[in-house]
Amino acid sequence: MFEAVEELIGEHTGLEKKLADPSVHADQANARKLNKRYAELTPIVSTYRAWKQTGEDIETAREFAADDPDFAAEVKELEKQREEITEKLRLLLVPRDPSDDKDVLLEIKAGAGGDESALFAGDLLRMYLRYAERVGWKTEIIDSTESELGGYKDVQVAVKTKGGNGATEPGQGVWARMKYEGGVHRVQRVPSTESQGRIHTSAAGVLVTPEAEEVDVEIHANDLRIDVYRSSGPGGQSVNTTDSAVRITHLPTGVVASCQNEKSQLQNKEQAMRILRSRLLAAAQEAAEQEASDVRRSQVRTVDRSEKIRTYNFPENRISDHRVGFKAYNLDQVLDGELDAVIQACVDADSAAKLANA
């Protein structure tokens, strides 16, 4: 059943020998790469060994049970254990997303629905900030444009693991969970400005990209156009009398990133470059995978109510994820950051699809 694992065991053994050689660690970048791959393979190897050992234990128990019926119960218990180990191993063999260890940049944009959409974008921001707090991630608002009523027309947030340099364990980065949030989120509720109690529908778009490191994307200075301007607050009010806001355009691709939240032009430029690197990395990955059914490609760039991935229905206190058929009636808790159940439903559906195609 798991013939391919033997090759992985061979690779794991080879890596173990290489990492035991002190000379390998002279090249730190290569050593990190080897260590990362070794860490990825270790749980597969240990689980496979447990799977084989359990199979041998079952055969032994069956031989004893032929002479002593008291061993029949032990056979059943071992068979149950092997089923659990088999499923665990199958999941470990699901093709990994190479970005799963990365931190992310999260962008929320108000869409159809005017002020109500901007308020909903603010609700989504709070939901993600609370979720990050619950799981122990760090967040940093990089850039934002507030609306008149206190919501957001656009807001960009960096979400990081505690270390701030991606996951310490394979597949445990922010991207591994947050990548499923990309798309159009629809809200159904009675706005505070609605005098007749009618339910309105509006939407906000969420874009999630893995945060790129400088080594991930090569950017040439002569490919950039950098514009500076005065940052502004809600309604266009000037909040800065100097040209500290920065907009960077990558001329070959037309990708644009901007930042105005920091106090100095240099800080805004650094933040805008972070955003630009991540957007270019995401664009390159999408181009390379355009023939594949990768979840990242389902993220919707245009905020159109008809292209929804999720609905937040306030009158029914219901949240629905239309991609996986998830439905729950605890919207108030979800908006307070209890997102694990809906995200896990997406993780499970993605794993099942990858297993089916493996």
Curated annotation (Swiss-Prot):
Keyword Protein biosynthesis assigned: yes
SMART domains tied to this protein: PCRF (SM00937)
Annotated localization: Cytoplasm
Molecular function as annotated in GO: translation release factor activity, codon specific
InterPro entries: PCRF, Pep_chain_release_fac_I, Pep_chain_release_fac_I_sf, Prokaryotic/Mito_RF, RF-1
Domain of life where this protein originates: Bacteria
PROSITE patterns attached to this UniProt entry: RF_PROK_I
Residues carrying N5-methylglutamine: Q237
Post-translational modifications: Methylated by PrmC. Methylation increases the termination efficiency of RF1.
Keywords, sorted A to Z: Cytoplasm, Methylation, Protein biosynthesis
Cellular component terms per the entry's GO annotation: cytoplasm
Role, per record: Peptide chain release factor 1 directs the termination of translation in response to the peptide chain termination codons UAG and UAA.
PANTHER family given in the database record: LD18447P
Family, similarity comment: Belongs to the prokaryotic/mitochondrial release factor family.
Protein name from the UniProt record: Peptide chain release factor 1
Gene that produces this protein: prfA
